[in-house]
Amino acid sequence: MKTIVVYYSLEGNTAYAAEKIAAALGADTLRLQPKKAYPSSGFQKFFWGGKSAVMAEKPALEPYAFRAEDYDCVILGFPVWAGNVTPPIRTFVLDNSLRACRVAAFACESGAGAEKAFHKLVDCAGIDRLRETLILIDPKTKPSEENERRIEAFCAALRG
């Protein structure tokens, strides 16, 4: 099964998890980058990131190489912003039909909102469901055995 992990990461938590998942599954990776970067700290990070997520904005992305037909499974990874999928992931799923792929997702959060974000992702991507989901609490900045166990279980479920 050919797999790719497509993700957006602002502070490194999602990138950390994406690399671990890709290594465990032997998957390709694609890190999405918006043409205009989001602020990475302070009040502006929460204001602009939250506004962009709540308003369902679709930011332009830096060019990337991806063809859905090259993959059996697409894993989407993102930080949760105001209970929403991050805008770069929204842009990606609106620009690329994933209906023929098995789609899974993982979300990194500091508080709550991942379940709500997964439902919005399903709607935005126009798919029936996510094959597997994974919620991590700040996996890079607050490493824990629980996060590691969750990553292992997620990968095992995707292999099976």
List PLM regions with ranges.
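N-terminal beta1-alpha1-beta2 submodule of the flavodoxin-like/Rossmannoid cofactor-binding fold
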Residues: 1-76, 83-85, 90, 94, ...
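A generic structural motif
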Residues: 31-34, 106-107, 132-138
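Glycine-rich phosphate/pyrophosphate-binding loop and the adjoining helix
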Residues: 129-160
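Short, conserved loop/helix-junction motifs that constitute active-site signature segments
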Residues: 68, 94-101, 124-128
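Short, charged, surface-exposed secondary-structure boundary motifs
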Residues: 38-42, 115-116, 141-143
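Short, aromatic/basic amphipathic alpha-helical patches
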Residues: 116-125
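Structural beta-sheet core signal
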Residues: 5, 76, 104-107, 132
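Short Gly/Pro-enriched loop/turn and capping motifs at secondary-structure junctions
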Residues: 80-83, 109-113, 138-141
